[in-house]
Swiss-Prot record:
Name by which UniProt lists this protein: Elongation factor 4
InterPro entries the record matches: EF-4, EFG_III/V, EFG_V-like, EFTu-like_2, G_TR_CS, LepA_C_sf, LepA_CTD, LepA_IV
Domain tr-type G, first and last residues per copy: 2-184
Species in which this protein is naturally found: Photorhabdus laumondii subsp. laumondii (strain DSM 15139 / CIP 105565 / TT01) (Photorhabdus luminescens subsp. laumondii)
Major subcellular location class: membrane
Domain of life: Bacteria
Pfam families in the cross-refs: EFG_C, GTP_EFTU, GTP_EFTU_D2, LepA_C
Amino acid sequence: MKQIRNFSIIAHIDHGKSTLSDRIIQICGGLTDREMAEQVLDSMDLERERGITIKAQSVTLDYKANDGQLYQLNFIDTPGHVDFSYEVSRSLAACEGALLVVDAGQGVEAQTLANCYTALDMNLEVVPVLNKIDLPAAEPERVAEEIEDIVGIDATDAVRCSAKTGVGVQDVIERLVKEIPAPEGNSDEPLQALIIDSWFDNYLGVVSLVRIKNGTLRKGDKIKVMSTGQVYNADRLGIFTPKRVDRDVLGCGEVGWLVCAIKDILGAPVGDTLTLARQPAEKPLPGFKKVKPQVYAGLFPVSSDDYEAFRDALGKLSLNDASLFYEPESSSALGFGFRCGFLGLLHMEIIQERLEREYDLDLITTAPTVVYEVETTSHDTLYVDSPSKLPPLNNIEELREPIAECHMLLPQEYLGNVITLCVEKRGVQTNMVYHGKQVALTYEIPMAEVVLDFFDRLKSTSRGYASLDYNFTRFQSSDMVRVDVLINAERVDALALITHRGNAQYRGRELVEKMKELIPRQQFDIAIQAAIGNHIIARSTVKQLRKNVLAKCYGGDVSRKKKLLQKQKEGKKRMKQVGNVELPQEAFLAILHVGKDN
């Protein structure tokens, strides 16, 4: 036990977490040089393509330290993106310490701060590491001061390394062996094992990643899931060295994987406690706080035959991704599907892409919305996550929208641009502090504005230097309206959006123009209108395609021409009564891009 070290690597996006973990694996000889690949832990295709870490991964390595002792390192590589912060908090719950990796060129960023505070709240030992010192732009002295100034941990003797070239990585390992405490726990007590993560394997069923807090887990033990009371048999267990390696025993303080032939996806929820059936622990371990989804969107299969497959896929994915929320929903325009809750737009994109890739589905997504709090005239409080569920305007006493507290860190020269952007997004400034060349800004901005495109716009106004961390604070009363889209006087429920009355006119007009470009021309006029209640605020028409019926008349009598035109007109009129309009997938996504390219 004294030789075990459990730690995570936390950092902002692109500060070199995954590369550093590659080097640590190489030094400890977890893989032969032939098996080594760049970012060996980012095993999903999607992670490799986008160059980001999405799922936290764990590895167990043996390291012979300079003091001659053999240490067992269990470490978990975590994502840096704000949308995946729950992955980070789950990983940290299984550790005693964390490496805080900071890019020596870019310095401290908002996400570094947020993840570091999460670690400090859980009483972990945080070891600062300055990475990328091989870059010409690196200023380790300045960044060390910045860490002290902004984060508040002593970084004067922070380890300096370059994960890419491998300089100083040995020192990083030595430092963490010294500074991070050994796990606490008692191997003689009843078993308590925390489920950190689980995923679905087509051959093995549910595979869980567990951290043994007390007791020991042996192969063949009968184990009990504490929240459901179900009893299973521990068929196989082992560790990752990134490869799966079977073991017979997982000792106290270790992190490993476990297969016990659970077929049911809800059999072993993440954050649950496992114990022995014959001598159960008295109380479960404190799990993780449930993450509330911030963004909701409807997901519908393109062909309704895929509905069953889609439901299974969502089930398997939600096992692997504890923050995904979903419930069945039906729409008159799109048929049956699910209303899903996500942590942010990136999370939504990733989930949609994983569903389409890993499960071969074709999906249509409706525009994302946030949750609104509605007080009706009969003084009931409702929570509405989709525009179509909003009660009629005259039944609403008060509509409250969620407000997000946004912490931004940016260089001084971009301050003006960023403040302009925040004001445009209806933000209210609550705090501003200067740290050397950096400015820390705090704004309260409506969640709806943050999830739409705030992050992208923030990056582009600051040339990528600003960083953002946001969290939900409260609901605040606001003048919101629902804008409906009518196509040939029929409401399309999937296209409705909730927006602030001040922006409604503009958003409505923009959306209608966008739809006009996307809907293909038919044999009759298509009227596209945006309306608030019964009040039309914008309209445009997709013009009909007309055959030139007069082409065959040479000169001749005007009444002949009139007759032909009249006949065409009547035909068009009849067509319009029976014709219906097919909306392309792009049309549903048009709402996302309203107000982006102005």
